[in-house]
């Protein structure tokens, strides 16, 4: 299951959960004291927010894969694209 991953640092988790829940028309798949994430299907994105950073904004981007074989395939595609 390949997904693009986006992680954003926010200052106010509750306010941000409310905003993104309205934006995505979905509740988070997981919520912790300092973290929430949505596993969206259209587009296929693992979208996460947390208060675990220095300042609000983009924390990191990535790809989510199920196993080492998918990771190797993705690595090969990235190397071929370069």
What would you call each of these model-derived segments?
Residues 1-2, 7-46:
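Core segments of cupin and vicinal oxygen chelate
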Residues 37-41, 59, 82:
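Short, surface-exposed, charged/polar-biased interaction segments
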Residues 3, 57-60:
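Eukaryotic phosphotyrosine signaling hubs
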Residues 13, 63-82:
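Vicinal oxygen chelate
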Residues 53-55:
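Short, flexible turn/loop "capping" segments at secondary-structure junctions
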């Amino acid at each position: 299951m390949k997904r693009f991953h986006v992680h954003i640092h926010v200052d106010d988790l509750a306010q941000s959960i409310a905003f993104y829940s309205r934006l995505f028309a979905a509740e988070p798949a997981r919520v912790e004291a300092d973290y929430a994430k949505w596993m969206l299907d259209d587009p296929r994105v693992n979208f996460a927010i947390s208060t675990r950073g220095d300042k609000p904004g983009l924390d990191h981007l990535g790809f989510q894969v199920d196993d080492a074989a998918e990771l190797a395939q993705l690595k090969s595609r990235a190397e071929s694209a370069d």
